[in-house]
Each structure stands twice: as structure tokens, then as C-alpha cells.
């Protein structure tokens, strides 16, 4: 009796602060409906979650690409087939994470699945007769002619989609990349025949260097004087992940090859030559925000 009187008194004393009920001698706070107010106060410290667009090819035909991307552990936000319809297929809502990027990074960001939109384009990648070309060791990398062309309608679909995404999410030009750019140790897509330069010139999509700047940096003496660590730092300045060894080992050459696939696709060799160096310097002058070029 005394215990119940004490509990009732405790509830009465605390009632101004919380509602009080008793169930089996247990004190419980009443729950009330609360309103989420998202208008009265607004924070300025915020940005879009989507920071980049990653372009892929599927290395498969339409049917297999659809099956792989809708039933397996790999997915993408968008799929562009190689047929003649007028559709771009949205497989994963943009608000959700698709499993398309995997391990790698670009522009200081890793786990790009969390911060990117993935676009898969149906394309075989390497022509069937060249798929085993690297196995005998005669070649380290596939040259331009080994890659499969993209369909014209596919490129127009890519252009429309990427323009829209880049505008809606305020994605910077240099963060519109290929899978190879963020994972050069294991990926080469969308390959040498993806028309990065055309997309830049005709649709204003992605990054490209100024020819005048490239010619300025085509200086053999400056190239010869540049150390390997300095050149690797230039790759990092643009956004590529590359090791800090003082040799052009296979991992480093993979980065060079990925860079060439994007910015010098007609001659992707994996070798750091004068033209590749000049293009890298020109890109950094234009996009990396550095002011020590002249």
C-alpha cells in the first residue's frame, strides 16, 4: 500500500515534465507525436551526396547485361542498350547506392559507390579476336584498334543523360570519369573508343585539355628534367590514385594507360611519354586550380 502511494506521488510530482503511467509497477514516459520542422532553420554546411558519374561498358550483349545488372550482385543506376529504342533504363533510384564502382578512388574519394551515379553501356569491350592478345606476353595493353566502337544512338543517350545528371547534381567536369580512371589496376572501361573528346566538344560534357596549353608543355627539356615523383604528383593533382615509388612499375603504368584511354585514346601504351606528360600538365593547368604553370 505504501509503495503504491509513493509511486503515485512520484508521478504527480513529475507530471509537469513527463506524462506518467504505471504498468506492473514500472514508470513509463508517455509518447507524443512530434513534428519535423525542416523550414525554420537551415544549415549552410551541406552539399550534394552525388559527386561523380562513372561510365562503364558491360562486356556483354543486351540480354546478358540486363540479367547481370538486375539479378546479381552488380548493378548500376542506368543502362543504355545497343538497340534502336528511345529508352534509357533506370535500374536503381538515384537516391540509392548501386554496386558498380568497386575498389578504387578518384579526386580524393574512395568507396565511390556511395557518392556516384553509375552508367552501364552495352558494348563488348575488346573485339573477340583480340581478347587473348595479352596472354602470351607480347603486349602489355590493348591498343586502340582492339576496342569495339559504340553505337551512335548510345552516345546521344549518354550525352542527354550525363548533361542532365551533371546539371542537377552540380558535378564538376573532371568528376565525369570512366571506370578505368578510378580503378586502373583492374578496369579498362569504357575503353579507347569511348568518345570523350567529342562529348566535351559537342555537348560540353566532362573534361578536356586546351590544345594551346598542351603544345606549350610539349617541351622535351622540361619533360626530361621532371622526376618520377613529380610526375606522379601531377597525376594525383588531377585526381588519379598512384603509388609513390620512384619507378614506372606495372601499377604505375596501369594509371598511365587509364589516363591515355581517356585523354589520348588513339595511342594508349602505358608508357609515360612527352605527349602524355604535356596533356597531364595542360589538364592540371585548366582544372586542378594550380597557379605555378607559367
Region locations from a protein language model:
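Second-shell loop/turn segments in exported
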Residues: 41, 66, 105-106, 141-153, ...
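C-terminal motif of bacterial Sec signal peptides marking the signal peptidase cleavage site
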Residues: 16-19
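Active-site-adjacent loop/helix surface patches within enzyme catalytic domains
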Residues: 25-174
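Bacterial N-terminal signal peptides that target proteins for export
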Residues: 1-9
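Short acidic, glycine/serine/threonine-rich helix-capping segments at coil-helix boundaries
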Residues: 221-283, 290-293
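Acidic/histidine-rich, metal-coordinating catalytic segments
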Residues: 171-186
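Bacterial signal peptide processing site
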Residues: 21-23
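Acidic, His- and aromatic-enriched active-site or binding-groove loops in soluble protein domains
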Residues: 45, 79-80, 192-219
Amino acid at each position: 500500500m505504501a509503495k503504491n502511494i509513493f509511486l503515485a506521488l512520484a508521478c504527480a510530482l513529475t507530471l509537469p515534465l513527463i506524462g506518467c503511467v504505471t504498468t506492473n509497477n514500472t514508470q513509463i514516459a508517455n509518447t507524443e507525436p512530434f513534428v519535423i520542422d525542416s523550414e525554420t532553420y537551415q544549415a549552410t554546411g551541406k552539399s550534394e551526396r552525388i559527386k561523380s558519374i562513372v561510365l562503364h561498358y558491360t562486356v556483354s550483349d543486351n540480354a546478358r547485361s540486363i540479367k547481370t545488372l538486375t539479378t546479381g550482385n552488380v548493378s548500376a543506376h542506368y543502362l543504355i542498350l545497343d538497340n534502336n529504342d528511345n529508352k534509357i533504363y533506370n535500374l536503381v533510384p538515384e537516391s540509392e547506392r548501386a554496386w558498380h564502382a568497386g575498389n578504387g578512388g578518384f579526386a580524393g574519394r574512395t568507396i565511390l559507390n556511395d557518392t556516384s551515379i553509375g552508367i552501364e553501356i552495352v558494348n563488348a569491350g575488346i573485339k573477340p579476336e583480340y581478347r587473348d592478345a595479352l596472354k602470351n606476353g607480347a603486349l602489355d595493353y590493348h591498343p586502340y584498334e582492339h576496342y569495339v566502337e559504340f553505337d551512335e544512338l548510345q552516345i546521344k543517350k549518354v550525352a542527354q543523360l550525363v548533361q542532365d545528371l551533371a546539371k542537377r547534381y552540380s558535378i564538376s567536369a573532371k568528376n565525369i570519369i570512366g571506370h578505368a580512371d578510378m580503378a586502373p589496376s583492374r578496369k579498362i572501361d569504357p575503353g579507347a573508343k569511348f568518345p570523350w573528346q567529342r562529348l566535351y566538344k559537342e555537348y560540353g560534357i566532362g573534361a578536356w585539355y586546351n590544345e594551346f596549353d598542351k603544345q606549350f608543355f610539349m617541351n622535351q627539356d622540361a619533360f626530361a628534367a621532371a622526376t618520377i615523383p613529380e610526375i606522379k604528383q601531377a597525376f594525383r593533382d588531377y585526381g588519379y590514385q598512384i603509388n609513390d615509388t620512384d619507378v614506372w612499375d606495372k601499377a604505375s603504368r596501369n594509371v598511365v594507360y587509364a589516363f591515355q584511354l581517356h585523354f589520348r585514346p588513339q595511342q594508349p601504351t602505358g608508357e609515360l611519354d612527352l605527349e602524355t606528360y604535356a596533356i597531364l600538365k595542360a589538364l592540371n593547368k585548366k582544372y586542378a586550380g594550380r597557379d605555378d604553370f607559367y
